[in-house]
Amino acid sequence: MSNQFSEAQHQLDALGLRCPEPVMMVRKSVRKMAQGETLLIIADDPATTRDIPSFCEFMDHKLLASQTETTPYQYLIQKGL
């Protein structure tokens, strides 16, 4: 795991879950976070490669890093406003 991913303040394990569950869990987790905090999402649903970046853009969160070459996929997001 890269150093950037290991520095996340929160972590969400969405392994084995299929659309729309991972994004629903991300949304619930982010609501509990303070602005600027980071969340590492670990998932294996191929739909997350599209859904997580779209969620971040739509909700004004920042996708800091992603690893989608191999499973499990990893996404590091930072909560926006």
UniProtKB/Swiss-Prot annotation:
InterPro entries: Sulphur_carrier_TusA, TusA-like, TusA-like_sf. It comes from the Bacteria. Pfam families: TusA. PROSITE patterns: UPF0033. GO terms for biological process: tRNA wobble position uridine thiolation. The keyword Cell membrane does not apply. The keyword Cytoplasm applies. The active site is at C19. One of its GO terms (molecular function) is sulfur carrier activity. Sulfur carrier protein which probably makes part of a sulfur-relay system. This is Sulfur carrier protein TusA. The gene is tusA.
